[in-house]
């Protein structure tokens, strides 16, 4: 699998299931619209007072499942990373990544409390269950940089 192959699969899916944990360690999940940077960063927007934003400010560890939620999709990416809330030039860069997938995101910029979250990957598992045996590949952050 090449870098382009993995990015192409991840970018084909505009939505993912995002998970975080609350301050009391309760698991919480949400479907979010995602954009994927060339460095495998995920970007999504949310409101600052949403459960996910509050959780990620307290504990930036986050996980996603991309793909595999439709009957015709037999491939998935499991993604673990660290979230942050960029500002300044970095915020503008990640916003442009997000707007390339969700142009209507610009219309939400005036929403009170809107934030953009960037997630840097620590670990990705790509699984394709179509071939037998299934193809399962794992990449840590160092391997992703070399891919």
Language-model features, listed with the residues they occupy:
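Extreme N-terminal tail/first-helix region
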Residues: 1-17, 142-147
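Alpha-helix boundary recognition
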Residues: 10-11, 57-58, 99
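A generic "binding-loop/recognition-motif" signal
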Residues: 48-49, 122
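Short, surface-exposed beta-strand-loop junctions and turns on beta-sheet-rich folds
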Residues: 50-52, 71, 132-134
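Charged, gly/pro-rich active-site loop segments
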Residues: 75-147
């Amino acid at each position: 699998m090449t870098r382009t192959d993995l990015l192409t699969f991840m970018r084909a899916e505009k939505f993912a299931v995002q998970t975080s944990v609350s301050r009391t360690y309760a698991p919480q999940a949400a479907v979010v619209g995602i954009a994927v940077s060339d460095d495998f960063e995920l970007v999504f927007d949310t409101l600052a007072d949403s459960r996910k934003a509050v959780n990620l400010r307290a504990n930036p560890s986050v996980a996603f499942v991309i793909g595999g939620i439709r009957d015709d999709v037999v491939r998935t990416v499991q993604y673990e990373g660290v979230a942050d809330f960029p500002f300044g030039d970095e915020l503008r860069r990640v916003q442009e990544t997000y707007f390339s997938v969700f142009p209507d995101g610009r219309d939400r910029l005036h929403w009170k409390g809107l934030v953009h979250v960037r997630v840097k990957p620590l670990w990705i598992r790509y699984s394709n269950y179509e071939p037998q045996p299934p193809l399962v590949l794992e990449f840590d952050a160092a391997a992703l940089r070399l891919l």
